[in-house]
Amino acid sequence: MVKVQKPQPKSLNKSASIEGVVKKKGKPEKTKKLATDATLELASNKKAKNAAPVKKDAIKKEPEVSKKGAEKKQSKAAKRPLILAPPESPAAPAPAAKKSKAKPAASGAPVGKKIEAKKPLILAPPESPVPPKKQEKKTKAAPVKAKKEPAPAKKSVQDPVPSIKKVPAAKKSGQTAALTKKTAKTEKQAAPAKPAKAQPASQLQKKAKAVQKLSKPASPPKSKKALSKSKPGQAKGNAVNKEPAKSKKPVELTFELKAFDEKRFHEIVNENNVTKVCAALKSVVSEEVEKKKNTSIFSDYRYVLQVCSYKIPSCPKRMVKLNLKHSLVGKDDDVALIVPDLQRGAKFDYDPTKQHYEDMLREAGVKQRLTVVPFNQLRNEMGSFEAKRKFLNSYDYLLCDGRLSGQATAFLGKNTQKPRNVLHSLRLSKDNDKLPQEVTRALTRTAFRQLSKGDLIAVPVGNHEITAEQLAENILLVIKQLQEVYPGGLANIRSMYLKIDITGTSALPLYVSMCAPPEDVPYVVGPREQRMLKLKKQANEVLSKFAMTKDAEFIKLTSDQVKRKAQLRKEKAALLAADAAPKDNDGGDAAVPAKKARKESSSEGAKADAESDEEEEVEEAEDSAGESGDEDEEGHDGDDTDEDEDEDDDDDNEDGDDDEDEDDDEEDDDEEDDDDDDDEE
């Protein structure tokens, strides 16, 4: 398809661009129309702005409008600058409202006059400079006429009139007139919305007062006042400032706390007082348990001794086991006994081992009902965590052969670290006569967990079937053992309370200490640390029989050298004690150096001595080795006694050499002592 352009618009418009010509032709026509329309609109706007004051003048000068119709055009044009000022005065909205009342009050004739006045106003723009002078004279004469007398009844219209006359007296410049025109628009638009509120100022003030009286009891103003008086930020600040004023000062002790007295402790915690407390607790607990029988499934419970300490000890985590006089196990309680297998291995059946130990207990005359559990059965059936926990919770008391106690606790896990689930060990020996005693001893035991976190421990001391006297005996035996086992001893005990292991029950005090707490934090050496210290001591004893050369080779010392080394140690310790004694007895306030500084100073001197002693010791060892080799070649026996005799003869002949050797040995011993001390530190 071929596109064809129409040539007619190009030939008609006589221009290079069709669209441009059309737009150019349209623009002048629109501008002309806009110019004429704009003039009309501007004129109408000016009329609308000046309509209100014109109407006021029309109301005042009704007879003049009727007589002189031709002069109205000129008079209105002349009054424009005088009428533009009132909109800025505060009384400007009042006259706008009065127009609405003036309209119904006037007759039909003035309304017609107003309409006639609007028509000639459209032709107002062409103004001549000559008529305004004549109009100004007329305006000056206008207030002289003051035709307010024909309408005396219209007080609402006449009262605010003088305020309007006073405002035009102050004439403003052309710049202020432009601003008043803009403000006049907004005021005149709002004026027709308030026709009914046009009232004198006195009445408006009265109404405003009445509104204020009604608004006083309302709640919103109260809230505002409260907010203005006290802001939320200020209120918080005041509250914070008042808190320290209210807080009481710490109570200062005016007396000194006495040190712990063990005799006084035993006077308070005696058998008579403990039995009274136990009897009172049993009577109180029986009532509380009856109330809680509906909620709890089991009726059995245990008595617990709660011990609170002054200072939390530094001790390893472990289960401490104590002996009791009367067993915690009741008649109907279930007790499990973990025993080793007769044949080790997961494939072997564990029924023969079970039958073997049951027969052995029956023959020995053990009266307590025990459930034998071979360790092979434990490994096969209790593999998961839930199964292990269920096994431990299904028994009231757990016994284990001493050969398996460590292995069984490691297998069952952390659930055995509770006083109720602890594995109490016993010895299953072949002697049937001692087996019942061993079982009763294992059943009369209790345990508590020792920690380095809290200051409270709970020790089970009895069950619900036990009497008050038996409970008191168990408590006294436990307190006697706590004196040795508890970290810090009895002096570190703040209080002791007796209660049962059911939550929500009461507790009775056995002992409350008012003594001064211990100065030092108690430190407990656990069984593992004791074993390590024992091994260290043995290692030091073995190393004391050897000496090290420069080439890092150990040389074994003779028996005489070891003895001499031990004597030198004792002498050295005595000298150190003698040096330290006068310093302590001086009584002066001399500053004692820190432990670290003392160690450094002593170690520096020891190192210097050690270097010289090591060289001499190595030379001696080499010389002694060479002498022994020569003697063997000559045919003498290699016994130590012969060597000692030869050495003694040589010492008699050569006193100087002997003295040197002794000095060397002493220096060697000093070096070894220093080395041992460093190792121990």
Curated annotation (Swiss-Prot):
Region of interest (Disordered), residue spans: 1-248, 579-681
Name used for this protein in its record: Ribosomal L1 domain-containing protein CG13096
Key words of the record: Phosphoprotein
Family (UniProt): Belongs to the universal ribosomal protein uL1 family. Highly divergent.
Pfam families with a match to the protein in the record: Ribosomal_L1 (PF00687)
Source organism, top-level taxon: Eukaryota
Biased amino acid composition, Low complexity: 103-112, 189-217
Start-end of Basic and acidic residues biased regions: 54-74, 599-610
Modified residues (Phosphoserine): S15, S17, S89, S128
Keyword Phosphoprotein listed: yes
Species of provenance: Drosophila melanogaster
Composition bias type Acidic residues, residue spans: 611-681
